[in-house]
Design a protein with these regions (language model features):
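Low-complexity acidic/polar repeat-biased segments
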Residues: 1-2, 71-140
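Acidic, glycine-rich calcium-binding repeat modules characteristic of RTX/beta-roll
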Residues: 2-5, 10-68, 80-90, 141
């Protein structure tokens, strides 16, 4: 698996490459997840520095979600799998899109999990969250 390290500045990152780990390094980074991620791609996001945001753009279609104590796995409707490690280091922005100047509904990791039907993050293992949903406006539908 390849790793793409971004800068120490505030980067806008649009993950799309299969078999790639994206690292923002320093700075307040924004990761944009959309339906443009290739079918069956495997993507990992890790960023432990800065105030980082995962934006799930309007129309993103998600087949399943899985939550662990500090990670989330999103399986998109096209079979792509996006794993976010260190998820407590991120805010989650439903409907946001920095490239379009759009702000969505922002929550921390626990709030994002709750919005996906997980009332409490597990201390070990993982639990399933929402499935067969899409981002409509600033909410799951």
């Amino acid at each position: 698996m390849a790793t793409i390290n971004h800068s120490s500045g505030a980067d806008i990152i649009v993950p799309s490459n299969n078999g790639t780990t994206y690292r923002g390094l320093g700075g307040d980074d924004t990761y944009i997840l959309s339906n443009s991620i290739a079918a069956n791609a495997a993507i990992t996001i890790v960023d432990t520095s800065g105030a980082n945001t995962i934006q799930l753009v309007n129309g993103l279609s998600v087949a399943s979600t899985k939550f662990a104590a500090d990670a989330v796995q999103l399986t998109l409707s096209n079979g792509a799998v996006v794993t976010i490690n260190g998820a407590s280091n991120f805010d989650f922005d439903l409907g946001g899109n920095a490239t379009a100047g759009t702000s969505g509904s922002v929550s921390d990791f626990a709030g994002f999990a709750a919005g996906a039907g997980v009332s409490a993050l597990p201390s070990s293992g993982s639990v399933a969250g929402a499935s067969n949903v899409s981002v409509q406006g600033t909410a799951w539908s």
